[in-house]
Structure formats: structure tokens, C-alpha cells
């Protein structure tokens, strides 16, 4: 019998009061942390896999077991999907999720000939910087980035571990400003939205609808928890 997923427990009320200061600090400074060798190698594997591709590329960041990467590959058959996660243990489960097939009318996962998706083990702090530096000369373009249920680090003292309050956020936005983030902690998305605003990026937040696309989302919705999504506006779009 599976245990009920825990709801977010936090000692933080609302958007962190230091968020603006933190985001602005990283906007005005350079992220100088050395890039790990294993992520450089993973990035080269991505380049090799894409080969002479000249179309859209979608990054599924924090992809976990890669179920969402497979869903994205089905939703965007004319794009190449790159799933990135730091955990080898999670990525080892990818083959299982890619093999699974169901006939549910609202959640059909048929794995016939899905060749436009691959997952890689890498540190996103480094991977985003490598993509940002390479993208100016790349034949392909990052058309969208997805962060589905990233670790929310809900303790107030952990704010700078959240992606939008980390030094990697600048590189993330350099890769692509078309972003979708999902979480079962609304405050996480409200903070992400505020960080985007500080970079002049507009976004909106709404409840998640439709079939679950990750194991976490499935567990949350089945236990009655509300899930939320943030999406940025396309350039020139208003809502």
C-alpha cells in the first residue's frame, strides 16, 4: 500500500522577503562556479545526439524518471526533447516508463517509434550555462523549458536553493524565456513569477488540468492535493 504523499510543510509565509534582493544580486554578478567534468561530458553527448538538427529543442529540467520527457515527445513530435536530471537512480527508471503502454483515452502512452527524446545525467547549474554559451552559434534553438515539480526546498532558510533564487537563473533565462513550471506549492510559483518580473518576463499561474504527466503529479492529484502551473507569455503576448 502506497503512503499518502506529504503536503508542503514550511515556516515561510508568502513570498520570501529577501527574494528581490537575491535575484537582483545574481543579475548583476557572474556565476563563477567551475563546471563539473561529468556535465561537460553530458553536454557533449547532447550535442552529438542532436547532430545536424536545425529545429526546436525542449529542455525537460529536473525530469526525474523521464515520464514527462516522453509525454513532451508525444506532444511535440517535431521537436527534440532533452530530459536532464542529476540523479542516476531516477534516470535508471526511464526505460520502464518508456516501455509502458496504456489505452486510457485521456492518457494514452504508446511508445511506438518515439525517437525524439533522450535523457541525460547532468547538473543543471552547469548545464544551463553550457547551453547559454553554445546557443548563439547552434543550428537549433531552445523553444521551451519545463520544470515539473522541482524540489521546492520549503524551509525559509533554503530560499537560495530554489531555482529562481539561485545564480543559475540568469543562464536558465538565457537559454529560453518560454517556460512552464509546475508545483504543488503555490508560493514556489509566486516566487518564480516575481523573479521573472525582475527580468522583465511576464507570466501567469493557473491550476493544472488534464492527465498527470509525472509520478509526483499523479500522487498529488490522487491524494487530493492541488497542483499549479506557471507559464510565461510568448513575446508580445498579453493575457
Label for each model-derived stretch:
Residues 188-195, 199-239:
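Class I S-adenosyl-L-methionine
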Residues 94:
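Conserved SAM-binding loop
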Residues 1-57, 67-75, 98-138:
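S-adenosyl-L-methionine
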Residues 87:
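Conserved SAM/SAH-binding beta-strand->alpha-helix loop
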Residues 61, 84:
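Conserved beta-strand/loop positions that form the S-adenosyl-L-methionine
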Residues 160-168:
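Charged helix-capping and loop-helix junction motifs
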Residues 62-66:
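Class I SAM-dependent methyltransferase "Motif I" SAM/SAH-binding loop
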Amino acid at each position: 500500500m502506497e503512503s499518502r504523499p506529504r503536503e508542503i510543510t514550511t515556516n515561510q509565509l508568502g513570498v520570501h522577503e529577501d527574494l528581490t534582493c537575491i535575484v537582483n544580486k545574481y543579475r548583476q554578478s557572474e556565476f563563477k562556479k567551475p563546471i563539473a567534468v561529468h556535465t561537460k561530458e553530458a553536454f557533449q553527448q547532447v550535442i552529438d545526439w542532436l547532430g545536424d538538427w536545425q529545429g526546436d529543442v525542449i529542455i525537460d529540467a529536473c525530469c526525474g524518471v523521464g515520464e514527462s520527457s516522453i509525454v513532451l515527445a508525444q506532444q511535440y513530435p517535431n521537436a527534440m526533447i532533452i530530459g536532464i536530471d542529476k540523479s542516476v537512480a531516477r534516470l535508471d527508471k526511464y526505460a520502464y516508463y518508456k516501455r509502458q503502454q496504456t489505452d486510457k483515452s485521456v492518457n494514452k502512452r504508446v511508445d511506438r517509434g518515439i525517437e525524439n527524446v533522450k535523457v541525460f545525467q547532468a547538473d543543471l547549474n552547469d548545464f544551463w550555462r553550457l547551453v547559454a554559451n553554445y546557443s548563439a552559434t547552434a543550428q537549433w534553438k531552445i523553444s521551451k523549458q519545463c520544470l515539473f515539480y522541482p524540489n521546492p526546498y520549503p524551509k525559509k532558510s533554503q530560499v537560495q536553493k530554489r531555482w529562481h533564487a539561485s545564480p543559475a537563473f540568469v543562464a536558465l533565462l538565457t537559454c529560453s524565456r518560454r517556460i512552464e513550471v509546475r508545483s504543488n506549492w503555490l508560493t514556489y510559483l509566486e516566487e518564480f513569477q516575481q523573479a521573472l518580473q525582475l527580468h522583465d518576463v511576464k507570466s501567469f499561474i493557473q491550476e493544472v488540468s488534464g492527465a498527470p504527466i509525472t509520478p509526483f503529479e499523479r500522487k498529488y492529484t490522487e491524494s487530493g492535493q492541488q497542483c499549479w502551473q506557471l507559464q510565461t507569455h510568448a513575446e508580445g503576448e498579453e493575457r
